[in-house]
């Protein structure tokens, strides 16, 4: 079984975290020669009407699919989280890829996707729980990735010593500041948000930076060491994720820009399976952090490290994920 298209929401979603999804869609579409089709979420606009809610109720679904037409070949659709309401994007001939699925969202997977031929989830902890609790549900693990075009051929010039960005563990941020205060010659920068816009911070000064993914990747290319962490590793994040700590695309992004990495992350099945320890040094105390950062600052990122990162990224390209999707569908 093949796919007929990829349903994209890029015309109705503009949040920065969707940008990597568009890259995945483009890479899969190019590799499998599939068209990108704009999502039409509901019958009369971008919000669900009473008719939509009736038409896409599970008990009415078989009739709505008959009325709306059904293709023999399924389409692919990315979801940041499991959807809350039924729509065109949850029909049985749409194969979902759910990127973030936290513990308190698990129940929505069987509710929304019970009639799918295959369901892909990018969080191994969630997949294992769903397989145990819903053994008849066609759940499959699909790790996050980067397109093959992001594999580096050379090492970029570096002028930032330590970079923190995204949802970094607060201990890492504190340790970064402490290290910079103890070593004034070190250039420590971090990317946060101000009034919803990405902001670059350095020595108490903030500068607005572009919200494009290209702007972020350019900063990564300039960074020697990137601080990494997984969701769910401190109290606030634990509450948000229910303790789930998946591998995020940030590890792949920093690997693509030839950065050393120091991080706080679990030694769970997903991190071991993807061999994150090969590219990111795990620390648990400031003493370990200090020694590791100090060592990496004087360790040149050379050809051995470049070769290692190339191998890591080749094993985790979006194109390989596309092959995995087709392989699963052919067996479904």
Language model regions located:
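Nucleotide-sugar donor-binding catalytic core of glycosyltransferases
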Residues: 2-64, 71, 79-85, 104-107, ...
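Short amphipathic alpha-helix with an adjacent loop that forms part of the alpha/beta core around
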Residues: 65-69, 87, 292-296
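Active-site proximal beta-strand in glycosyltransferases
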Residues: 75-81, 87-102
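Active-site donor-binding loop signature of nucleotide-sugar glycosyltransferases
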Residues: 99, 144, 167, 283-285
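A charged, aromatic-enriched C-terminal amphipathic alpha-helix characteristic of glycosyltransferases
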Residues: 284-287, 294-331
């Amino acid at each position: 079984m093949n796919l007929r298209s990829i349903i994209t929401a890029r015309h109705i979603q503009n949040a920065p975290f969707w940008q990597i999804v568009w890259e995945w869609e483009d890479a899969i579409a190019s590799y499998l020669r599939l068209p990108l089709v704009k999502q039409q979420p509901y019958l009369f606009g971008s919000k669900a009407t009473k008719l939509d809610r009736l038409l896409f109720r599970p008990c009415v679904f078989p009739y709505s699919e008959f009325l709306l037409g059904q293709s023999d070949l399924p389409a692919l659709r990315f979801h940041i989280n499991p959807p809350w309401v039924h729509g065109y994007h949850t029909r049985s001939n749409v194969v979902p890829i759910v990127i973030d699925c936290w513990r308190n969202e698990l129940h929505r997977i069987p509710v929304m996707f019970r009639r799918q031929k295959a369901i892909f989830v990018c969080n191994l902890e969630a997949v294992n729980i769903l397989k145990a609790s819903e053994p008849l549900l066609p759940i499959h693990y699909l790790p996050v990735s980067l397109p093959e075009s992001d594999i580096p051929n050379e090492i970029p010039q570096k002028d930032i010593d330590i970079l923190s960005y995204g949802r970094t563990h607060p201990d890492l941020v504190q340790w970064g500041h402490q290290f910079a205060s103890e070593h004034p010659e070190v250039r420590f920068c971090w990317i946060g948000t101000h009034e919803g816009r990405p902001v670059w911070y350095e020595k108490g000064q903030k500068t607005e930076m572009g919200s494009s993914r290209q702007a972020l990747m350019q900063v990564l290319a300039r960074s020697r060491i990137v601080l990494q962490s997984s969701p769910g590793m401190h109290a606030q994040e634990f509450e948000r994720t229910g303790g789930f700590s998946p591998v995020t695309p940030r590890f792949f992004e920093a690997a693509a820009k030839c950065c050393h990495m120091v991080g706080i992350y679990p030694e769970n099945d997903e991190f071991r399976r993807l061999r994150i320890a090969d590219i990111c040094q795990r620390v648990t105390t400031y003493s370990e952090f200090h020694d590791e950062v100090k060592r990496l600052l004087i360790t040149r990122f050379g050809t051995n490290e470049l070769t290692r990162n190339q191998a890591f990224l080749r094993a985790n390209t979006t194109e390989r994920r596309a092959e995995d999707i087709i392989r699963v569908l052919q067996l479904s």
